[in-house]
Amino acid sequence: MSTFGARLAAAMDTLGPLCVGIDPHAPLLADWGLPDDVDGLRSFALATLDAVAGVVPAVKPQAAFFERHGSAGVAVLEEVVAAARERGLLVIVDAKRGDIGST
């Protein structure tokens, strides 16, 4: 298997340089008519993956929005990473803390 950088460069050559963030914060889930729980996280994230697969090379789930639901939220994050890979998307998990507010 090639390096992540090589796979990213190849995907960017084909699909361009965009990376879609997956930031399922409570107000956004509410806007989508989804509950602020692990089922809402899963529905939002999988719908996002379906919408962007084949359009962008990568997605970036924000770990904190999943972690706030405890171990069940982390399990959903793992599902999302696996589902993204199955759809041919590269994954960059955003797990930094304290750098900026929500963007």
Language-model regions, residue ranges each:
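Active-site loop-to-helix "anion-binding N-cap" substructures in soluble metabolic enzymes
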Residues: 1-103
